[in-house]
């Protein structure tokens, strides 16, 4: 989808596969994770070019993806979803599309690869694997794109699913705090990146909250995506707006402009 908040106009292109993420490319067009492939999409011509295919022989697909401050794309895969998500097999991986257009595997044995964010000073990377219900923090070297010193930053394993849900997509505000979409809990929760403790939550008329980012002319509006995938008939009766895009105003915080892919679009 391409949505203009001023006019309310929404355009869309239907691709051949499940779309996990989309990021702009500096050289034009968009990079998207579609099924197990990274593709380049030219919006005007609707031309789709496959750049890479991953996880050969596995039933996986790309899920969340985002660019680091240097313009690399970090994107991960997930296996087939199960009703009991914490029991899913860890057959996904986290990949990095480097500036020369090459793709490397960074982390393996991932359940549901999800939210990504980088601190304002560029020295820390945050990463969510939804299956264990955890967010991790890594030291990040922007010059090389290497990560290290993994620690568990937020751990919701064992906590109430209706209250805490599964951590999904995320973003950071300019105060350095993390806003995390929580699947199954109806909430986006703001966490302190100093203590890992929740500071604030925003509740929605939907249970499957998938991701969030700041937008608007002042980057002070929080856009929140939700899902209706595999929602029961009873759930849809209670929360008919599941699957909608929401916009939240008046939070009193701002976000950062989204990074774009700065690298090569050459097919490898």
Briefly describe each language-model feature range.
Residues 1, 37-39, 92-95, 134-136, ...:
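A short loop-to-beta-strand structural motif that recurs across blades of beta-propeller domains
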Residues 1-15, 35-39:
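Beta-propeller domains
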Residues 7-14, 48-55, 101-108, 150-161, ...:
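A short beta-strand motif characteristic of beta-propeller blades
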Residues 16-31, 56-72, 91, 104-124, ...:
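Beta-rich, blade/repeat-based domains predominating
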Residues 25, 30-36, 73-85, 125-132, ...:
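Conserved beta-strand positions in repeat-built beta-propeller and related beta-rich domains
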Residues 83, 138-146, 193-195, 249-255:
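Short loop/turn segments immediately following beta-strands, especially the blade-tip
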Residues 133-134, 138, 155-197:
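Loop/turn-rich, solvent-exposed surfaces of beta-rich toroidal or solenoidal domains
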Residues 213-268:
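Blade-level signature of beta-propeller repeat domains, shared across WD40, Kelch, NHL, RCC1
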